[in-house]
Amino acid sequence: SAEIARQLFDSAFQTEMGYTPVTMPCLFIPETYQVYWDMSVDDFFKRMQTEHKRFWNDERLAQATAIGMTPEEVCTLASIVEEETNNNEEKPIVAGLYINRLHQDMPLQADPTIKFALQDFGLRRITNEHLKVNSPYNTYINTGLPPGPIRIPSKKGIDSVLNYTKHNYIYMCAKEDFSGTHNFASNYADHMANARKYWKALNERK
């Protein structure tokens, strides 16, 4: 409702809930909820808090601590992972790749953050001009995580970060079969070989 939207963007309310304007989406855990049409705004947010605490149980909080992240940081990384791949089996691998980059103080270089910075998720190809956008969400020019999530991640997305796959990958490129999955690489030479395969397939597709 409009009342819920107003409350969401109220800075005093955000602070009271323990969030900032950019981390507020982390409150919400996607699920099918049964709510009544006459539920008050306060009751709605109390319900969301209850569901958030239920999801972020002691086990998940311990997992977040073990990987050196707050729940908000996990949520932020999960939002990027889910924009990179729809493949649930691949999500922990992508999460592991970004965590490797964070540990090496490398920019994440995540294209979805550029789309978010430009507020254009319909962009099909990111150009060098797009990479110059002046935004804290530009993970090509800034290291570390962006200030907050670029979407509300699913439970699977969050769990893929908490249970990320350990490997040496720091690069990925869309597969040349256009399956929506990726080829991964631990060095730039292998990454460029993967990229050439993809570009060749892309040019042949035109």
Task: State each model region's role.
Residues 5-6, 10-206:
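Bacterial extracytoplasmic/cell-wall-associated proteins, especially those involved in peptidoglycan
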